[in-house]
Amino acid sequence: MKKIFCFITLLLSVEKLIAQTTYSKDIEAQIKQVENNLAERVIINGKPGNIFDRMNHYNVKGLSIAVVQNYKIVWAKGYGWADEKEKRPVTTKTLFVPGSISKTFNALGILKLAQDKKLDLDTDINTYLQSWKFPYDSLSKGKKITLKHLLSHSAGLSFLGSDGYSRTAKIPTLQQLLDPNPASGLSGVRSEFEPGLYHQYSNGGIVISQVLITDITRQPYEKFMYDNVLKPLGMTESFFNQPPQANKLKLLATGYNADGTELAGKFNIIPEQAAGGLWTTPTDVCKYIIETQLAYQGKSAKLLTQEMTKLHLTPTVDPVAALGVFIDKRGETKYFTHDARNYGYSGVYYGSMEGGNGVAVFLNSFNVDLLPEIANSVATVYQWKDFYTPVFRNEINLPDSIFRKYTGDYLFENKLASIFKKQDGYYYWADGINSKMHFANEQEFYNQEFRVEKTFTNNAAGKITGYMRKVDGKELPPAIKITNPDTLTVPIDQLNSLAWHLIENKQYQQAIQYLKRGIVLAPNELSVTINLAHSYLFNNEYDKAIKIYAKQLTTAITHNETAKEMISQDFMFFKKNGFDKKLMRKVLSDLKLEIPKGF
């Protein structure tokens, strides 16, 4: 208790140090309201929280906020530490590299080139690419990828995940990132389905657009983006330089992991600048929000015309995915938005399509959970209609003896869910999300992340049979507890996703059961077979695992990834998450596969 009190006292003293601007009494009162109205979707056992308490709860070292009202930035403020060891506080000038918000500004760069007739958004990207060409194959079904596809994540491309690179590492070129390289654990960017079919988020597509910009303009990406996008918007504190310039280092927020430990090297280098390499401030991002709101109404054109701005904010294949932004409808009000997450950082912004409201929030933390609480508080204080309507619920504590009978896997509407225990409580997994369980009574539970309320059901003998589901009082098809995975006939991606979740939580026996069923349902699905090998491996059944690995190394390409690439990628993931590195090295050695650097 004493430590917590000291931490909060320290933060309060830091707040005094970082008061960069003196506001009117009315604005100061609004700031205090925002600071004391933080809340999740469900407010449990009481009232909204205080910003310092919530920072402490989530291990967030520092954050920065800027708020827009009536097309003006009404206040901006920093909280906590930009660097805890250096005792360097967050100010409104502190720079963050939150991640995918970069995609919004990359889209503006493409749209500016289209507005200037330097390119066409509906033309094959290979028309403009010079230093690298996209290798079409049969999966694209003869259809060509356009810039509209890339910016709206509808090009049918693989993801291209990246954690960034340490400041001492050798940084790959974009061309090296775009082409498969099993030795370095890079899967490259290739077609997974035909362009324009549906939405699939892809960093890879955005990286291709970055290459395209440099090929067309014959300028370094960061120079073109500063001169033609950031500077016209008045975002003069921001930049895309990777690594950052030496004279900016003292303005950079140090990144922190979700547990509050400092990121090695303080920040990573991100060669995928368009996808996640923008260093910026909430104040600068709010300048973009305001200009976009005004340009949308035809009242400004610092960068884009009204016509091009409307195109920027218009969804294409997916009803919410526009060009560089997502459209979030709350009641009758639409917001353009993008969230973001890099290792050590996270952020989000919202701008209303009408009315001139907005907010941008950045954290130097990999933990994103505080972001919606701050956005909800701003929306409440500034009365954004329908943006946030809290649900008030009570929670009771249940003994493990009751909890244990609920653990297991469930089936609802052709989807799978799982209930399991972690050190800090019981969790509900579905759709790839781990969500903590809160109980209103012995059988009814709810989650912050899901609107569906759930009530366990049991038979006459008291055995749990499933749970009832409802939203806003409307009954949904119930979930049934799975007693025999061998009878399941669900989509293979559901089986595979659940199995991967079980592997992550070291429930290898259960994973094996589901993956065996997956092979019956989809015998040619390479990822299912490889995941079965992983399950055997970590379940101390080495011979079974190595036999499957060896056989699959001769299997044909599935989704343009060979078994070798899958094994390499998955092992890199397992290594980062504390799995047995020596065991995986033995597999790679026995299979005569190249061992990636740092393994």
Predicted feature descriptions by range:
Residues 57-66, 85-149, 191-204, 273-276, ...:
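Short active-site loop at a secondary-structure junction
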Residues 79, 83, 137-343, 347-349:
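Short, surface-exposed loop or secondary-structure junction motifs
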Residues 20-77, 214-227, 266-496:
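Catalytic loop of the DD-peptidase/beta-lactamase superfamily, centered on the K-T-G motif
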Residues 561-599:
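Terminal, low-structured helical/coil segments at or just beyond the last alpha-helical repeat
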